[in-house]
Regions:
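Non-heme Fe(II)/2-oxoglutarate
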Residues: 3-98
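Catalytic core of non-heme Fe(II) oxygenases with the double-stranded beta-helix
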Residues: 75-87, 91-208
């Protein structure tokens, strides 16, 4: 129950520039091993400021994102364990109270991300279907800590950059001005992350 333990014991709050929570040590070392065990393909991709690389409709970055589903849950058992933690009533009750959102009848979505040099993410607010957004950073490659997510003011000025430190991350719920993204920065090898969401649309993982 690494995630739940971190939520209860290693969480801090900030409201600059919008409400969010910093979480420390949410992942076991075995889970981090699994995140790094995933082999993403090499090759040229086009970065367009979106997570999916889909401004042209081509979904250019789909191969650099792996969703944990029933087809790979056995292979990635530690990450599947994290899905089950998120499905549990203990976890949903805690996060629901934290972000003041009703997570009943929601679904868990979990994906491993491998951002390569050239990737950037334009400032945006998440879609309303994302009830909770969280990125957990894993940084075993010694990447610069400035590769964490950028949070913006309503005028789209960078207000703060969350440090890209291994086994740390953040949680927030979409608000009117919860602008976030990633400025264009140098990635030496790879910016690998784990994205956690509670969503209203159906996935294979309904909450308990």
């Amino acid at each position: 129950m690494t995630l739940i333990n971190a939520l209860k014991n290693n969480l801090s709050h900030s409201n600059v520039p919008f409400n969010h929570w910093i979480i420390n040590n949410p992942l076991s070392e075995k889970a981090i091993d699994e995140i790094y065990s995933i082999n993403f393909p090499e090759g040229k991709v086009i970065f367009d400021g979106t997570r999916a690389g889909d401004k042209t409709g081509d979904n250019l970055l789909s191969k650099l994102r792996i969703f944990i589903d029933k087809d790979n849950a056995e292979e990635y058992s530690e990450l599947f364990g994290l899905v089950k933690e998120m499905q549990s009533k203990e976890c949903t009750d805690f996060i629901s109270n934290l972000i003041n959102r009703d997570l009943k009848n929601s679904y868990v979505r979990l994906e491993v991300i491998a951002d390569r040099d050239g990737f950037w993410l334009e400032p945006h607010c998440d879609i309303k279907e994302k009830l909770m957004s969280s990125i957990l950073f894993v940084n075993r490659y010694g990447e610069n800590e400035n590769l964490g997510t950028d949070f913006y003011t309503p005028d789209l000025e960078v207000a703060k950059t969350l440090p890209y430190k291994n086994n740390t991350g953040y949680i927030f719920t979409s608000e009117e001005n919860s602008w976030h993204g990633l400025e264009k920065k140098k990635i030496k090898k790879e910016r690998r992350c784990l994205q956690l969401n509670y969503v209203t649309f159906e996935t294979e993982w309904p909450v308990d």
